[in-house]
Amino acid sequence: MSPKLRRTIACGQRVAAAGVFACLAAGTFPGSAFAQEAMLRANNQVWVDAGVQQLHYWEDIGPGKSDSERGNTAAFSLGASTQRQLFGVSNLYFSGAVRVAHGNVDYGGYLQGITGQVVQPNYQMTTRSTTTDVTLKAGKAFPLHLGTWNAQVIPYVSYSYHDWIRDSSRDPYGFYERYRHHVIGGGLMGQLEVTPKLVATADVRAGAMVGSSMTLAGSQNTFTLGNKPVIVAGFGLDYAVARNFHVNATYEWSRFQYGRSDVTQVAPGSSAYEPDSKTINQTWMIGVGYAF
């Protein structure tokens, strides 16, 4: 572990005599602080990933009125993380990632007349879906040992931004909608050194949705949606092919809801509302990273 990197774990800085003795004693066992280099390498890294995101969106409207989007799209992400000492505090953890998923999904819905009656209950078309997710995390790692296994837990606070473009405008009865929201929350990440080169990570977080909205192309107003809790969980593996070259695989599951909007004017003499909806996204990614 290079001292100039200033990354620390349990024995990372000058401490009182009792603390030094504890660190020296820990170093005599297989689960020593130094042995946690694998997690430090995994957490001090920049990476690029590619994979698949499965979208499942549906609206709760009423009997005979279904409105949903479902399908798989190509996903790409870029991210970076670091675990180090900062301002005299050891094992601070920071990460940031941007992910974009784009592709065609299947719309299942209905057509209605001017008075709102259903004129075609099962209408199918193709939607171009583009989702953008930005996630930032800040926390502190607490190293521990599970028998002879090296591990650590990282409680953190988080911010995320979600943007979904729902574009079926190529269809004669299609539309163009853009959904957006922010999430402020926190979570807990657990990491385990499976081998000196392989690190497994489990992560779960939840947060409060803020500023959710939907913009409809051609409308003179934006629909203000109801804010609901957001839950995200995931699992990942990071393998050090070489000291600085890593490969990774991740899975993430997320669920959120939008509450019904107020009746909103979309054109002179015409108003509408956005119904309650639910979204479940599942994302599988593989990629490469550079550990520093």
Q: Whereabouts are the PLM-identified features?
A:
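Short glycine/proline- and aromatic-enriched beta-strand/turn motifs that initiate or cap beta-hairpins
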Residues: 34-108, 278, 283-285, 289-292
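Short loop/turn motifs that connect adjacent beta-strands in outer-membrane beta-barrel proteins
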Residues: 35-44, 83-94, 142-153, 194-200, ...
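Residues that define the transmembrane beta-barrel architecture of outer-membrane proteins
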Residues: 42-44, 70-76, 126-134, 151, ...
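Transmembrane beta-barrel strands of outer-membrane/channel proteins
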Residues: 46-54, 94-102, 155-161, 190, ...
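Extracellular loop and loop/strand-boundary signature of outer-membrane beta-barrel proteins
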Residues: 58-70, 117-127, 169-177, 213-226, ...
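Residues on the lipid-exposed face of transmembrane beta-strands in outer-membrane beta-barrel proteins
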Residues: 76-84, 134-142, 157-159, 186-192, ...
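Outer-membrane pore/translocation modules
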Residues: 99-187
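Predominantly the C-terminal beta-signal and adjacent terminal strand-loop region
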Residues: 222-292
